[in-house]
Regions:
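Active-site microenvironment for binding and transforming phosphate-containing groups
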Residues: 1-222
């Protein structure tokens, strides 16, 4: 299990490996690559009651919340001032539609969060070198007002069965930039730097197929 020192003694945050066992129950939703955000108030909330939510937040101590990923980008947030946390599932659609900023704005509305106080973790996800996309995805990003220059690369003609050529996007970096645009200090953002496609310790839908297992990315206030 990959643990993050986001606030030792106050918060536990981690990403599971494929052979990890959860240390306790983690509330997760049925994710649909959307931007709906759920406020969780019961540590025993079952997954079926969270249909269609790709981000969860809570201010309940002892309530572990999380998101399931297998190449998509997990973002975990902690507000040490208002004492609240959030877990975000940000695939290319969620990144395109700014689910991370929307979650921060929701935390501001519900908890009074100041983005400058937030501590963030961007967990393992597919890296730019491995995230090959079609031209239509690039156009979606351009059309949605996102400056793709810092996150885009053209790696030459696309070859059948290879991830090396074609268009590539850096969802990890885009989520970091989106957090900073919201006011989260760069120094407060931890990036794991691990690629789920390259690192066999993690499940990867692109490497193994969509029916593979999922990595659990969780956060809990103590």
């Amino acid at each position: 299990m990959l643990e993050y020192p986001i606030a030792p003694g106050k918060v536990e945050a981690f990403t599971t490996f494929r052979d990890s066992e959860l240390p306790y129950f983690v509330v997760t939703g049925h994710q649909v690559h959307g931007t709906r955000i759920a406020l969780v108030t019961d540590p025993a909330t079952d997954r079926d009651s969270l249909e269609g939510y790709d981000a969860l937040m809570t201010n309940v101590k002892g309530c572990a919340i999380g998101v399931r990923t297998a190449d998509c980008i997990p973002v975990l947030l902690y507000d040490p001032v208002k004492e609240a946390v959030a877990a975000i599932h940000s695939g290319w659609k969620g990144t395109l539609n700014r689910i991370s900023p929307k979650t921060i704005f929701r935390m501001k509305d519900v908890f009074g969060t100041d983005p400058e106080d937030l501590k963030a973790v961007i967990g393992p996800g597919i890296c730019r070198n491995c995230f090959q996309v079609g031209d239509e995805v690039v156009q979606y990003f351009k059309g949605n007002g996102i400056n793709i220059e810092p996150i885009y690369s053209w790696n030459g003609p696309r070859q059948e069965g290879s991830m090396k050529g074609g268009h590539h996007l850096d969802l990890i970096e885009e989520n970091r930039l989106l957090l900073m645009e919201c006011g989260v200090p760069a120094a407060n953002i931890q990036v794991s730097g691990l690629c789920t496609y390259e690192d066999g310790r993690f499940f990867s839908a692109r490497r193994e197929g969509a029916s593979c297992g999922r990595n659990i990315n969780a956060i809990k206030m103590l």
